[in-house]
């Protein structure tokens, strides 16, 4: 199981939001690339980067910061405002290893299919769940679509990786929604990366146990717990490598 430490960028800075609310923002670092260097020093191969301004605006707003993170030498999984093919191509041209589609994936299966045909496993889809429905446009709106229905559609299109975020637990440090993660893993063959709620080492232990039952549970994104020093990245990486 892969650990993906998270960097959320807003106004060029590293921040965390609570349940995606722009007004509940905590600034953790002025330079996101410095944070990426710390993650790399701890032994992380991957970093999960979200352009929050891009998610709200509908197109990436912090590509210079993303490029600086790529230059650190990590594999970057990047999302936030990638709603056109041109935006996806710009991100990949920066050296991003995997892009995450969100809003547009819920709106257009043909768009996803076209990108999967062109870029293969560099395309991931973020499935952001709010009470079982898909949240879109920076989580400020909800589509009339269940998360499991969208997941199955993406699986059928050949999307290699699904990133499943439970918004109710995101940034709350209350523990992940294991039942929701298990339900999604059971519904698809795609790799699943769990996101939302990790607050302590045992949360990752429990996800690793879930991954033993569901081989497609491929990773977990850890954000606020790292910044609040509830967990140590090097410890989580060792735990994941042993599971």
From Swiss-Prot:
Catalysed transformations (reactions): 1-(5-phospho-beta-D-ribosyl)-5-[(5-phospho-beta-D-ribosylamino)methylideneamino]imidazole-4-carboxamide = 5-[(5-phospho-1-deoxy-D-ribulos-1-ylimino)methylamino]-1-(5-phospho-beta-D-ribosyl)imidazole-4-carboxamide
Pathway(s) per entry: Amino-acid biosynthesis; L-histidine biosynthesis; L-histidine from 5-phospho-alpha-D-ribose 1-diphosphate: step 4/9
GO biological process: L-histidine biosynthetic process; L-tryptophan biosynthetic process
Catalytic residue list: 8, 128
Database matches in Pfam families: His_biosynth (PF00977)
EC number: 5.3.1.16
Localization per Swiss-Prot or TrEMBL: Cytoplasm
CC per GO annotation: cytoplasm
Record's keyword terms, sorted: Amino-acid biosynthesis, Cytoplasm, Histidine biosynthesis, Isomerase
Alphabetized InterPro entries for the sequence: Aldolase_TIM (IPR013785), His_biosynth (IPR006062), HisA_bact_arch (IPR006063), Isoase_HisA-like (IPR044524), Isoase_HisA-like_bact (IPR023016), RibuloseP-bd_barrel (IPR011060)
Main location as per UniProt: cytoplasm
Keyword Amino-acid biosynthesis: yes
GO MF terms, alphabetically ordered: 1-(5-phosphoribosyl)-5-[(5-phosphoribosylamino)methylideneamino]imidazole-4-carboxamide isomerase activity
Family: Belongs to the HisA/HisF family.
NCBIfam families in the cross-refs: 1-(5-phosphoribosyl)-5-[(5-phosphoribosylamino)methylideneamino]imidazole-4-carboxamide isomerase
Protein name: 1-(5-phosphoribosyl)-5-[(5-phosphoribosylamino)methylideneamino] imidazole-4-carboxamide isomerase
Species the sequence originates in: Opitutus terrae (strain DSM 11246 / JCM 15787 / PB90-1)
